[in-house]
Structures are given as structure tokens and as C-alpha cells.
Amino acid sequence: IRFPGLISAFTLPSGGTSDYGPEMLHAAAQDKPYACFVREDTKISFMAMPDAIKSLLMLVDVPREKLNHQIYNIAAFAITAGEFRDRAVKAFPGAQISFAPNPRRQGIVDSWPEDVDDALARTEWNWKPDYDVDKFFDNYFLPEIRKRYGK
């Protein structure tokens, strides 16, 4: 399985190239300023960790003879860094988020697709994420961030 950027509500981001979104929310919840290392219009695919686990469990249950491919892309939602910022500001009014692109890291992200085609996984083993962008923020990520920081 080829995963998009995986986000867990229960672990802290660890400085990965796709961690700018979660880093924004953690900073906003702590009333800390955050300078995002990619451009505001940067868009890539993300997925909630429970959906990543679900995909692995689904795939392992498919009889081998029913699979026509060796590699499957899976996707959940694609969002820009600016949209992450907007969600952070909406959830934590007064959040101080700016954009200060790092050329090296921006170059890495620019080499990735904005979204991925997971049609093979959807067709061959009925892949479908539980978390779209709204459910990810409203039902998974933000409740845990608020709980972690007492907000």
C-alpha cells in the first residue's frame, strides 16, 4: 500500500515533510506562533491513522487470487496548507500561523502529487476511507488536540 501523509491524533508530529498540517494545529492549540515551511497553496493527500490501519486489515483479508495488482494507492482527502491554517484559526481563534517556505522542503513536497488515484483499491477490495476532511477534523483530530491541551 502507498499511503498519503498519515496523521495520528495521539502522537506528536516528528518533523516529517508532511507534518506541517498537524504542527499548525498543535501550535495553535498551545497559543504558539507557527511558521509553515511550505507555501500556502501547497496541496497533498492526507489520511487519518485509523483509516491507514483499516486499509491494512481490509487488504490482508482479501484472497490473493482476487487481487490483480501488487501495489495499491489509497487516499482519503487532499488539502492545502492554507486550508489547514484556516481550520486551525477556526478551531483556535487567535492562532498565529504564517508561511515561510523552506526551499529544500518545498521542493520535496512539490515533487509529490496533489492527490492520488486509489481507484484500483476501491475496485478490487472495496477500499473507502471513513474520514473525509470534515470528519477528520471534527470527529478525530480536533477533539483529541483539544483534550491533549485542555482546550
What residue spans do the PLM features occupy?
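NAD(P)-dependent short-chain dehydrogenase/reductase
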Residues: 1-43, 49-51
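C-terminal substrate-binding subdomain of Rossmann-fold SDR/epimerase-dehydratase oxidoreductases
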Residues: 37-39, 45-151
